[in-house]
């Protein structure tokens, strides 16, 4: 009886520790449902119905593994990915990594910031510039939570992630997808045309985000509760839950677009404004409003995460620190320039996703090298199977993103 009591109390302690260590993956998961994902998933669903849902499933499984490895690096070494690159690579390589990571962080932020501004424009009827001002104010307010520590920020961003998930549950109810076809689309790989291959590459490129690979390793590096194995076990739960929610949102985006647009003859829906305006007469004003609100929530939370990632990149690579409000002020300038110049915001959003393709392999390769290093990782070193899967992901991601890049440059 005493043994069962001890086992029960140790089980409760393990659950308590697991709960206490949850949060970092929810911040990272926001990067997987940013406005770039909205645009890509809507276009894929409108063009090909449920046929590309399997890409979302596999991309999400890859992303889960990548985020576990990133978090594990921070747990095992007490240093984030940028710091490990700084410690192990020659200075010119480190500076190259810093510059490309900053460019990619800004490109990511451009898409996220403009996405939130479009959301405000759609639901409030304001101009895109006014939407951008509202986005700037809102992100400053959210970033102020960082002064109170990481946990309040985790709670707010986790809440926004859950809001977007709830919004898409409602959208699925409104759109009433065919569950049999939906299940087939998730389970059976299909690439019916060259455009489908291009969109599949876009879905993968919009799913695996280099900036959250850097960020996640920094969010776990200073956790000291429990043993390393206990922290790693808790992290796997954290990633599993957060990334499952993010994966559901991506599936729901594509399934809603398929049910609402593709099967109603609107196969050419390709941008966020058009999706909003098409949803209203097809489903209802409420469905369109919920879409707009979810876009705002995803844009705001992901642009905050992008700002945090940029801070980690700068501090990790070059040991230079600037206040978050200064970084936020500087990184939102390109968005205002794009808007003031009257450029097509959705086109800019898609182009920024293409730019991200350069950074994915650059983040993944050192991550796999470091997490496969026994002297660095100790008992948390990657197994042979994980190493093989990791390098297969690198090859696949590089190949598909090269396809995406070439197709974009050639106007395919």
Swiss-Prot record:
Which InterPro entries does its entry note?
Answer: NRAMP_fam (IPR001046)
Membrane spanning segments where? Answer: 19-39, 46-66, 94-114, 122-142, 155-175, 196-216, 241-261, 290-310, 329-349, 350-370, 389-409
One BP annotation, GO = iron ion transmembrane transport
Task: Tell me which Pfam families the record gives.
Answer: Nramp
Membrane topology type, per the record?
Multi-pass membrane protein
Which molecular function terms from Gene Ontology are attached? cadmium ion transmembrane transporter activity; manganese ion transmembrane transporter activity; metal ion binding; symporter activity
Q: Per the annotation, which location comes first and is thus the protein's main one?
A: membrane
User: Transmembrane helix among the record's keywords?
Assistant: yes
The keyword Cell inner membrane appears for this protein: yes
GO CC terms of this entry: plasma membrane
Alphabetized, the UniProt keywords read: Cell inner membrane, Cell membrane, Ion transport, Membrane, Symport, Transmembrane, Transmembrane helix, Transport
Q: Indicate where this protein resides in the cell.
A: Cell inner membrane
Function per UniProt? H(+)-stimulated, divalent metal cation uptake system.
Which family is annotated? Belongs to the NRAMP family.
The name on file for this protein is Divalent metal cation transporter MntH
